[in-house]
């Protein structure tokens, strides 16, 4: 892609004149290059320490946050019993909880193809954030008929696990990439109806007989993230189809294809 812009060669040569840690021999090689292809091997030379000093950075600025995730959680629960006769009562219990988490991925260094330095000149540390919601409620009626204890109840619960990827990018989008993506959700719900019978056995002390019925429904779903979070885009900004020629793929300065999807966790 870079060969398509004839201005780039001149811009690089002009900028090289302003870099004070390039010696005269190296500058001469850059000025003598007649194409981007001739510049590519020259600009792979390692100037890490000099460039860090020029940018006012240290190696610690490229550290990962391993085992240092943050967490915020809230919970609310209720428990209630309402007697309505000598032997029968209504009951209910349940709650709602919410948890937000944030963890870091691997640092994307500026010399990697998965980093578009036009947006992240110093690389970046992508963050995986999660929003987890849990809800549950149980309600029932229980009591006695003769020596039998009877309990009829219904329990409903659901969970949603949503991913948002922040401080990241879809490298194949170049300058058009956002820095935050909806990367999808996982959902689960369950509903259970129970009817239980139990009574003590008169012939055996501390022994009981019990039986019951249960009906359970479960549902699980995976919700895809937004298209920007998983698609790879071509040089025109459209979704790159499978089998597309390499000439349609976005590349970095050195000709490496730029990956699609949100870095650290595509949707």
Feature roles, as predicted:
Residues 1-105, 117-122, 126-140, 144:
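Transmembrane beta-barrel wall of Gram-negative outer-membrane proteins
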Residues 79-101, 125-267:
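Face-selective signature of the C-terminal outer-membrane beta-barrel domain
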């Amino acid at each position: 892609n870079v060969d398509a812009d004839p201005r780039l060669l001149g811009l690089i040569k002009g900028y090289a004149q302003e870099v004070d840690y390039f010696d005269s021999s190296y500058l001469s090689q850059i000025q003598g290059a007649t194409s981007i292809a001739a510049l590519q091997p020259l600009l792979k030379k390692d100037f890490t320490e000099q460039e860090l000093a020029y940018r006012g950075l240290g190696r610690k600025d490229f550290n990962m946050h391993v085992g240092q995730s943050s967490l915020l959680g809230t919970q609310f629960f209720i428990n209630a019993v309402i007697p309505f006769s000598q032997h029968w009562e209504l009951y209910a219990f349940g709650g709602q909880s919410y948890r937000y988490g944030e963890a870091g991925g691997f640092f994307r260094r500026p010399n990697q193809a998965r980093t578009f330095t036009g947006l992240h000149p110093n690389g970046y540390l992508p963050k995986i954030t999660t929003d987890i919601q849990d809800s549950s409620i149980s309600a029932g009626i229980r009591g006695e008929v003769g020596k039998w204890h009877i309990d009829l109840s219904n329990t409903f619960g659901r969970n949603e696990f949503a991913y948002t990827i922040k401080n990241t990018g879809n490298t194949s989008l170049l300058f058009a990439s956002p820095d935050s993506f909806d990367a999808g959700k996982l959902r689960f719900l369950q509903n259970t109806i129970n009817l239980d019978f139990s009574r003590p056995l008169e012939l055996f002390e501390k022994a009981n007989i019990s039986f019951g019925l249960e009906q359970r429904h479960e549902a699980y779903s995976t919700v895809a993230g937004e298209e920007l979070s998983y698609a790879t885009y071509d040089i025109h900004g459209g979704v790159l189809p499978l089998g597309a020629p390499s000439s349609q793929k976005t590349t970095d300065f050195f000709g490496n294809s730029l990956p699609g999807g949100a870095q650290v966790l595509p949707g």
